[in-house]
Amino acid sequence: TNTPEQDRYLQAEKYIEFYVIVDNRMYRYYNYDKPAIKIRVYEMINAVNTKFRPLKIHIALIGLEIWSNEDKFEVKPAASVTLKSFREWRQTVLLPRKRNDNAQLLTGINLNGTAVGIAYPGSLCTQRSVFVVQDYNRRMSLVASTMTHELGHNLGIHHDEASCICIPGPCIMLKKRTAPAFQFSSCSIRDYQEYLLRDRPQCILNKPLSTDIVSPAICGNYFVEEGEECDCGSPAACQSACCDAATCKFNGAGAECRAAKHDCDLPELCTGQSAECPTDSLQRNGHPCQNNQGYCYNGKCPTLTNQCIALLGPHFTVSPKGCFDLNMRGDDGSFCRMEDGTKIPCAAKDVKCGRLYCTEKNTMSCLIPPNPDGIMAEPGTKCGDGMVCSKGQCVDVQTAY
């Protein structure tokens, strides 16, 4: 089991400031069409983000570089050689110029063997936080699956064993895939959490500024980008009561975001300045409730009848006043309060604030709910018009709170 601090770290939203290089071969393959390449990369990033959402990671594209003149280092078919060259180029050239958490080389070269991608495992926030993916198929979703897979390796996730499952499949970390992968398996999530707690990568905890993002804003990707006030996902998935998921704008001030649950609760309204509903607030203590049968106390409406029903069941109600007069005796079970270990009898006006008496409906008995010390009337219970129980006495509701 994890410590609370470990759980906080795992639950924290994480952001990968992501830099993509498109090499010269890929540029030529797409007929020197930079706008088309950009759209393709933006679509890939969006697809990758959808896959990483359950892991609480957002991929923020903070740089896209297309090598339209020539490659800045030699891109070779040997995947491991190109990965090493890319790592060195990022370290010496890219990082001094543009800080990033992770960089990807998207290449048009045909990598040796069956490989379409390669990554350093468990390397985020280090000098080895890079991976290479071959743009091997016109289907964007297939290449985006490979991007997700290789970035998964950077995040300490291993290939899935035969016992790892995800429904619907196929799983992202399968060694061989023919169809676009759907989601991470339970094995992948376990690997990722173990990696996080072992290596504690810190660079993914800071949230990039919306002005740093180079991809166009997408309403519904859970990330507040330029022109958006909030982003809580799709309208079906949105959990933020004061964010309009369709427009990514705050709901107007005064829109009800949480209805009153009962008459001792208050409705909450959006402020117009936040995506979240304000903290749940309660009706003030002493406010009449349940058709004047009680007065609100800490968000509840305590009455003697409700106490009897809660303890004994729906066939019971509060006893007639004659039963409560027994509380003036001050003996074993019938008293108002304790002082220094002594049971203090009730004054006549306080009898309904002492021991609780219940009656089965249509009978005249003075029943005491089973408890060796007797059950006392709850604080805040109505004991007369404008009167409530406080510390075993029946006092004016105005002075009680």
Swiss-Prot record:
List the GO molecular function terms.
Answer: metal ion binding; metalloendopeptidase activity; toxin activity
Residue numbers binding Ca(2+) 3:
265-266, 268, 280
Which residues does the record list as glycosylated?
Answer: 112
Keywords, in A-Z order: Calcium, Disulfide bond, Glycoprotein, Hemostasis impairing toxin, Hydrolase, Metal-binding, Metalloprotease, Platelet aggregation inhibiting toxin, Protease, Secreted, Toxin, Zinc
InterPro entries named in the record: ADAM_Cys-rich, Disintegrin_dom, Disintegrin_dom_sf, MetalloPept_cat_dom_sf, Peptidase_M12B, Reprolysin_adamalysin
Any single Gene Ontology cellular-component annotation: extracellular region
Cofactor dependence is on: Zn(2+)
UniProt-listed Gene3D superfamilies: 3.40.1620.60, Collagenase (Catalytic Domain), Disintegrin domain
Indicate the residues that form the catalytic site: 150
Q: Where in the cell is it found?
A: Secreted
Show where the Peptidase M12B domain sits: 14-208
SUPFAM superfamilies from the entry?
Answer: Blood coagulation inhibitor (disintegrin), Metalloproteases ('zincins'), catalytic domain
EC assignment: the record states 3.4.24.-
Q: How is the cofactor bound?
A: Binds 1 zinc ion per subunit.
Which family does the similarity line name?
Belongs to the venom metalloproteinase (M12B) family. P-III subfamily. P-IIIa sub-subfamily.
What the protein does?
Snake venom zinc protease that inhibits hemostasis by binding and cleaving the vWF in humans. Also has and inhibitory effect on the collagen-induced platelet aggregation.
Q: How does it assemble?
A: Monomer.
Protein name per UniProt: Hemorrhagic metalloproteinase-disintegrin-like kaouthiagin
Species of origin: Naja kaouthia (Monocled cobra)
Q: What is the lineage of its organism?
A: Eukaryota, Metazoa, Chordata, Craniata, Vertebrata
